[in-house]
Amino acid sequence: MKLIFEMGAPGRGCDLIPPCTPPEVTVKVPMRKKALHLPEVSETELSRHYTDLAKQTHGVNDGFYPLGSCTMKYNPKINDAASLLPGFTNIHPLQDTKDVQGCLEVLSSIEEALCEITGMQACTLQPAAGAHGEFTGLLLIKAWHESRGDSKRTKIIVPDSAHGTNPASAAMADFDVINIPSDEHGCVDLEALKAAVGDDTAGLMLTNPNTVGLFDPNIAEITRIVHDAGGLCYYDGANLNAVMGITRPGDMGFDVMHLNLHKTFSTPHGGGGPGSGPVACKDFLAPFLPGLRIDKQTDGTFTAKTAAHAIGNVRSFSSNFLVVVRAFCYILTLGREGIPEAAATAVLNANYMMHKLAGHYKMAYDHTCMHEFVMTLEQEKHERNVSALDIAKALLDHGIHPPTMYFPLIVHEALMIEPTETESRETLDEAVQIFLDVLTKSQAHPEKMHEYPFETPVRRLDEVGAARKPVVRYISWEMTPTSIGGEQQAGISGGSQSPS
């Protein structure tokens, strides 16, 4: 397949801009001396190019997408339509608040809804993704300790069953990361936690249910231990889909958390975004929240102002506003009855699929799971040299997206499966049969498993090479070649370059 830069011809285009003479503008920034090298293609070529690209990818609209810890549920298209209403799209973030009262009402209403769902009292919608929310929440914890003159609290405790971005976010916020192990049941080791807390503990980061799909039965004791040591408790909302509307992080003893609107609340997040990672917190942390705080006045109008001790903006304006609109539509559609039903169905689907696969694949933990479960291919790797990667690649030839591989790290040769609530029983049965068929193939012809996939547009990629020596932009021969590592990298390797 050609890159879009390799298509078209000089002078070809798809714009219909009428002739005009733009006014001269005096700018105070450097201007380009040469025109951008952009593809010159017709609208037909452009449409076909991106249609071809779409055919080579797999999304939730194409088929089963059980990517563990990612909650790849169906994204209702009516939410997209609502977010594209002119009242939402034809506005500017610098407009006066009196001109955008409807938008402020949406922001205020979803903040209120998220607080009700989580058991928190205040919320900011500024963070644009989950890890961004983690970082923001950790800055709130840091600001609170510093406001009390308690600067010695420099350590964040992170269990080995926590979400993968937690240690990185804590380090980014300039905390020392203290890892503690799980017990034999896959939950937090209470004795290890007691030994880890002290007068230098700033807080604990925890995902519940955790990344092996288990709800920690000692959650109230865990948060009590941290609070007794003077620390705060951070809830990673990555797995909130399993418990939304049923139990609330605030009631478990957590002080601050983030939510993933692009996961739990069904906004699109394939292809890298856009996402949204709001942070909700208890009252005592509200003065530190970033961005504008929206208040409803007695006359029904809304105002926006900065919190008294705000940590500063973590993103410009109201972040990914149209993503928030989509999530708000989802919440309104499900309501107080539908939200817990969705969570219960997600748990039911995961347990149904786990039960069907148990006895064929080895489960990492022999417990009732929540919204996802983890299988281990360690035995297959040892006996037949068939890895989790081999199984995942073979699944691609059957039209389903592979599960998350090699995560969580505490499970060797892991495959983490999250079917979500939007899949039917028929789809789950079909997926189970595919998993069983692939396992049978691996037992009959283990050596062939290293060659999968056969039917995808691209076979096995050099994933190690891509990670260590990524080529993330296209450089054509028409542009000035750049020397990288002693080689001319302009236009190298054709299709290996990033398209468009």
Where on the chain are the PLM-derived regions?
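Proline- and acidic/polar-enriched loop/turn elements at helix boundaries
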Residues: P66, P127, S182, N208, ...
